[in-house]
Amino acid sequence: MTDDTTLRIERLIDASPEAVFRVWTTREAMESWYRDGDDFVARVVDLDVRVGGSYRVEFGPRDQEPFVEYGVYLEIDAPRRLVMSETLEGVETPWANTKVTVELEEENGKTHLVLVHENFPTPAHRDNASGGWPGFIDRIERLVSRSG
């Protein structure tokens, strides 16, 4: 069950949990999917994938000031679980100290991905994030899919 400040997305991806986990934890892969469209660019400024390590991604339209997302890795259980804090700046509805949990489970040779993004300050903030995550996951799926 989710409350009105929690976003939950599930997807079955035609790739191994290891492959899906890798795109969440490598600079080059993150720069491929961490953007809202083909006219956006992403730059991973900091990526220290360990509990207590930090990440920082600048992304947005090519010729504009970037949006900035950053946080700290709270839990890592490769290739099954990744939990991190997330703060977003540079947008109309910024947020601070939300929590993103990514769970990956092997299911019939594929990966069942469950993403839970919680602790938004308001339902409007959650709705804003719900516009971005599906596209991010679409790009992740294209990066790792065996059928594409």
Q: Language model features by range: what are they?
A:
Residues 4, 10, 18, 45-46, ...:
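Charge-dense, helix-prone N-terminal extensions
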Residues 25, 137-148:
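Short amphipathic alpha-helical signal-transduction/dimerization elements
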Residues 42-87:
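Glycine-rich portal/gate segments that line the openings of hydrophobic small-molecule binding cavities
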Residues 1-41:
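Hydrophobic ligand-binding cavity/cleft-lining segments
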Residues 3, 47-49, 63-67, 92-96, ...:
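A generic structural micro-feature
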Residues 83-134:
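Beta-strand/loop substructures that line and gate deep hydrophobic ligand-binding cavities in soluble
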Residues 20, 30, 55, 73, ...:
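Hydrophobic pocket/interface hotspot
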Residues 17-18, 49-50, 74-81, 103-112:
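A short, structured loop/turn motif at beta-sheet edges
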